[in-house]
Amino acid sequence: MKQLFSLLCFLLAATGIWADGHGPVFGLATPTNSKGEWSFDTGLFGRANDLGSEASLRALVGYGFTPHVSLFLTAPAVIGDLRLSPTRIQSGSDFEATVKWRFQHRATKVGTRIESTLFAGVAAPGPQSGFDDLVVTHAPGTMFGAVTGMASRSHYLWLGATFTKFYEHSGSKRPDVLDYSLVYGYRPARWRRSADRWDWRVFAELVGEHSDRFLETGSPVPQTQAHQLFLGPSLLGIYRNYTISFGAQASIYQGLGSLYPKERVRFAANFSYLLFQHSH
């Protein structure tokens, strides 16, 4: 735990590293990159249970082909080797390519807009995505999802879900994962700043994950199903083309198979640099 805390402090102090600066750190949101905008991201996503902690470092590159269509590529590296339920929050230990299409972008009044975004992608389990005592395939999966919501100068509200289906290989299969989230954000008037000063907003994030059982030699593995809910705050700060966000969540519901220790806390820190930024 001390090593993970030291690593987090190092990342918070570092310069020249990036993360996803478009919204909350755990839940889904509608923003995409602007046309011609590159985003360069680095993030830390951690999980802790009764046996210790594990963290996933990720690098992400995004590009906006149009004001509403973006492509994102993610590569992770895992620190630790705990037995934890499957997760698709911030890709976990999976390599991923995702296309986002913001198909609804409607202004209802000055400073307020309604948006909806669709997701489609491919996930490939990395070399660190194994599971003790099980024959786990690294066959890829496909992901589809959607998120909708409202954004104004002061308030944000997003509701969304994604479903990732992994494919069977030689009788083995990883669990399919459904994740869903509800996010509320608030940007107080006193926190609003011009582009040359830090501009902050706070989020309350509710995230749920449901996964079915592993498949081994063609048969479901007992006690490997999972359903969890997490709730917690996060902060997002924007300064010119740089953003920083961080947060933590506590478990509020756990329906886990006996193969998994109870997960207590999740934490995340994200850093982002946006190049050729345009308005959304």
Tell what function each PLM region has.
Residues 44-48, 75-81, 103, 122-126, ...:
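Transmembrane beta-strands of outer-membrane beta-barrel pores
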Residues 20, 47-55, 79-90, 169-175, ...:
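Solvent-exposed loop/turn segments connecting transmembrane beta-strands
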Residues 53-57, 90-95, 114, 136-142, ...:
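Residues that define the transmembrane beta-barrel architecture of outer-membrane proteins
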Residues 79-175, 271-280:
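Outer-membrane pore/translocation modules
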Residues 40, 59-63, 73, 97-103, ...:
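Residues on the lipid-exposed face of transmembrane beta-strands in outer-membrane beta-barrel proteins
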Residues 182-280:
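Outer membrane beta-barrel transmembrane domains
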Residues 38-42, 71-73, 97, 112-120, ...:
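Transmembrane beta-strands of outer-membrane beta-barrel proteins
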Residues 29-36, 51, 68, 104-115, ...:
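Short loop/turn motifs that connect adjacent beta-strands in outer-membrane beta-barrel proteins
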